[in-house]
């Protein structure tokens, strides 16, 4: 019942239930449908992981091929830069960039690629290219006068790509988890809905304390499914491209 102090006045009331399950994925403490954030966050998470994996892998592949082919001071310089970069704390640097510079997803993506280029992959690819460099077809290409660029990009790099595909596929979810980790720490892009941002808002809104477990479980489940799916695909591709596992 309602009481008014003016004759002929009317009251319009609407019942609002905060945090109750409504729609496909439920709502948060501000009555926003979580399915919208989860659906919008899916292509963003996958695109972040894909671009980071592509940028890192291709750059490492080219740098390793150039380092192996030319050798000398170029190879020594790249190895020293790699050794120094591997000592640097990766996550704290990203936290500093997000805290003091910018939390834009494009800035974070560029920083992740730049910090990941001179990593352990450089040394792994270099060891593979050392074997390819001594192959007979490389000697044949050198004997008929092929240029350095042609040998690197036409004969060396394509030779290694099939062996890198399984590892490349498995690398994508690691960058998806990295972006989500930064968002959970409050360093995600405030203008873009991501899975990590949903978990961060669930923590800030007291989801577990208020019994809204779905608010945390749904994005966590999507992250788990993403990692599992790429792991299965990477394992299957490894059995296809790895000659040692092909007959098993």
Where are the regions a protein language model picked out?
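Alpha-helical transmembrane segments of integral membrane proteins
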Residues: 27-248
